[in-house]
């Protein structure tokens, strides 16, 4: 079925089992079943966690942050804690160092650390590899006895990515990586981080969810992602609401009419409002046991991302078109867009046929072979707890 994503090992000097280390954190990547580009609009999302990244961490009293990644062919990087500042680092180290900056900015007096990272989350695949790189605060939380809860760590990681790295991402990735449970999808209200764990055991129902990494890379900080976010904020301002999640689905036509000739903004608003409704529809279908019917909702979601939000690409469209022609139950792109991955819902018996059809289509188009693997919902870095929409966020580490 193509390549598998396994559990990484923080081997060598950073081994999680080594006596010299004093902490080990685990954080997951994620796939998002439905709810794309809704998190920074205070809407609903529904991610599940993928296999973990591992970080081995030890505390240093010297104010030096020493970073090493098993996935980067380079010597360890040493940074002075006092020199950490937004826009000071544009390499992969910006993600873990940004979290230390955010923790210190929030008033937590930390010294330094040795950090060794290992990951199987593909970079640029739309699977939250950046959030996985922020694994270290989970171990730091224990090492320094900070007593921060999962949702607080998620907020700090988001601030690190927004301010320190310069990527205008929402809160979904960080919360999913921290709070997802095995065998479940996380129904998350990104406005207040209230959440509900929805059972999502496809194997028990004779189905599988495949992730197809097109190997086309993207970068959120290169402009297009930010343009969409700015357009959504403009739409909310024109409609007189705090965020687009405040536009009821039943009032969408009236809202679009109020936007007049702002065609680009109209498209963005239409996607966000209809996507929120799609998330709620998928939740209802899963809770009623109508799991196969979510495939049609995934198809709708891809059309909206392609035609209204305009963040798909030829490689992603090739995956979804080929999969649907090969008897897939549903498919759509996932992640920030402009490359990355698609998810494909299939009957278990059709996994090999659909995988081969996609691989053959890429070969015929002269493209690099896609990376195909099964998405089995895993536990993230911390268990999630069910809370009501009006209650306080409740994912505890």
From Swiss-Prot:
Entry annotation: catalytic residues: 173 (proton acceptor)
Residues binding Mg(2+): 130, 161
Main location: cytoplasm
GO CC annotation: cytosol
Swiss-Prot/TrEMBL catalytic activity: alpha-D-galactose + ATP = alpha-D-galactose 1-phosphate + ADP + H(+)
Annotated SUPFAM superfamilies: GHMP Kinase, C-terminal domain (SSF55060), Ribosomal protein S5 domain 2-like (SSF54211)
GO process terms (BP): galactose metabolic process
Localization in the cell: Cytoplasm
PROSITE patterns for the chain: GALACTOKINASE, GHMP_KINASES_ATP
EC number: 2.7.1.6
Swiss-Prot/TrEMBL site (Transition state stabilizer) positions: 30
Keywords assigned by UniProt, alphabetized: ATP-binding, Carbohydrate metabolism, Cytoplasm, Galactose metabolism, Kinase, Magnesium, Metal-binding, Nucleotide-binding, Transferase
Pathway(s) served: Carbohydrate metabolism; galactose metabolism
PANTHER family associated with the record: GALACTOKINASE-RELATED, MEVALONATE KINASE/GALACTOKINASE
Protein name per Swiss-Prot or TrEMBL: Galactokinase
Species in which this protein is naturally found: Streptomyces lividans
